[in-house]
Amino acid sequence: MSVPARVVTLLVAFALVALGAVYVVAHFVVGTLPTVDYTHAASGGVVNVVLQETPENDSSSKPDWVSYYVMKPGANPFQPSSWVHTTLLSVPANTRVNMTVYGYDGCTPPRNNLWSEVQGTLGGVMSFRQFLNANKPKGPTFVTSTLNGWSHCAVGHTFAIPSLGLFIPVASPDASASLCATAPCVAGPYSLEKFSFRTPPHGGDFRWQCFVPCGGGFEFGTGGPMQTIGYMSGQMAVVGA
């Protein structure tokens, strides 16, 4: 077989493997997780989405993995039954998304301090506030375009949708705080973070994930929960009219 023919054969084989991986993720991983539907919760072109990130989770297979949870629309964030262990959610197209993130996990310095910068939000900023416990603030609310994870222990994870140019550092509780020990977290110290962005005018599926090396026990911290849907990686379905 000639060299060009071998190259073509290898490229075709690689493409088939890649397509197979996409099929497995789409049909076996995503297909087994529930999707929290926020499309019917939108009003006046606005929808409020609530997440939390935790130092552990309530699964039987990987309970020690850090994870995101999605709250049911309009639920009470301090009731365990309000939270769904999934990273799949759906929102309407051409809608302002007001996102709230309850950060219960400790800090992990980002590998690149680019992830300390707020990118793609409306106004280019986000707000955060530290809490000692449910609705017990520790200090004032800060509005910022940067949460420097290198100068001090401040960033727990990130929420990023690369295809929308959206990257937000998620604040961690105070470095001396005792972290939540039972997920979903409804008590203990946390950071409360808020930011807004607009969904595209068309429907589609958009991958989101954390870019902080939060995969403890894996090489470079980038494996395990960081790349697994249902933990620190997820999908936002934008539903067109």
Write out the residue ranges for each language-model feature:
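Extracellular/periplasmic metallocenter environments
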Residues: 18-30, 124-241
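Extracytoplasmic entry segments of secretory-pathway proteins
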Residues: 1-149, 161, 240-241
